[in-house]
């Protein structure tokens, strides 16, 4: 692209990246030599090598035998002590994982004119949203990431509204994650003295599902920005499929240090969300995590968020409090909690205070 055109783009980043639908991917492909000021984050929000614990990582759990009590114990221990773990031999074929990744690339390689059909301004449903950064309209510093978010209601709605370039593989992958989610939650509920997930519990734990596809293009100055800022998820569980590039970092519980989550072929990264932290009365931990930008490679990831339904009341489960344990959190309407999360830029775990009993 001629330098004059590049200068024009840089003079109005919001128009090019957000309104025209090019995203940060389009910005990266201009051949930038330096990071635009809009993406420069304050030093305290950047991650340096001094902050990373190199000899520490989250557990990798073989779940080939879901019925083994030892597997359930490993899952519960990881949820209590780390909030993050990886699972292997989970039953989703490698071929399906690869198809989900390929679908991600297909969508983001579409022309900007096609992608922007799914922006807030253009898409006829709020259940599908193409965007860049997290909340670009209010953030002081933008995140180096594009994403497409798809809230699943039915196959019929997906067929009508989800992008054709990724729809079929995204729906298939999302459905394949349902069994894994259920098995994980069965194990986690055992640790909370919940012996059976009945219909009401199932709705509360996994009543709604959302799949995102994320694209992190290579960045000219990755040390000055973030792929995703510090945050915890508001889900019950998140199941993350990452590629082989790496870049996800997790805060160590009660420490300022961070651990890298190395890609493991065929694995899914599992993390506890705020909703499950609240339901477990703090026993299971929803942990801050972040994504670093990369100078050499484009990176993708595919998270599936397993959530309560918007009209569900989320609070400590009765089984958790049955022994007389004092509640740490008050019951909250899940849609109110979600609105609180989306009110401002990523800022660690501050959203959980919305439900905490003072």
Curated annotation (Swiss-Prot):
2-oxoglutarate (OG)- and Fe(II)-dependent dioxygenase (2OGD) involved in scopoletin and umbelliferone biosynthesis. Converts feruloyl CoA into 6'-hydroxyferuloyl CoA, and p-coumaroyl CoA into 2,4-dihydroxycinnamoyl-CoA, but has no activity toward caffeoyl-CoA. Belongs to the iron/ascorbate-dependent oxidoreductase family. Fe cation binds at residues 231, 233, 289. It catalyses: (E)-4-coumaroyl-CoA + 2-oxoglutarate + O2 = (E)-2,4-dihydroxycinnamoyl-CoA + succinate + CO2; (E)-feruloyl-CoA + 2-oxoglutarate + O2 = (E)-6-hydroxyferuloyl-CoA + succinate + CO2. It is an enzyme of class 1 (oxidoreductase). Pfam families: 2OG-FeII_Oxy, DIOX_N. Keywords: Dioxygenase, Iron, Metal-binding, Oxidoreductase. Mostly expressed in underground stems and stems. Optimum pH is 7.2. The keyword Cell wall biogenesis/degradation does not apply. This is Bi-functional coumaroyl CoA and feruloyl CoA ortho-hydroxylase F6H2-2-1. GO terms for biological process: coumarin biosynthetic process; phenylpropanoid biosynthetic process; response to fungus; response to molecule of fungal origin. Residues 200-308 form the Fe2OG dioxygenase domain. The keyword Metal-binding applies. Its EC number is 1.14.11.61, 1.14.11.62. 2-oxoglutarate binds at residues 216, 299, 301. Induction: Transiently induced by fungal (F.oxysporum f.sp. batatas O-17) and chitosan treatments, in association with the accumulation of umbelliferone and its glucoside (skimmin) in the tubers. GO terms for molecular function: 2-oxoglutarate-dependent dioxygenase activity; 4-coumaroyl 2'-hydroxylase activity; metal ion binding. Its cofactor is L-ascorbate; Fe(2+). It comes from Ipomoea batatas (Sweet potato). Pathway: Phenylpropanoid metabolism. The gene is F6H2-2-1. Gene3D superfamilies: B-lactam Antibiotic, Isopenicillin N Synthase, Chain. InterPro entries: DIOX_N, IPNS-like_FE2OG_OXY, IPNS-like_sf, Oxoglu/Fe-dep_dioxygenase_dom. Binds 1 Fe(2+) ion per subunit.
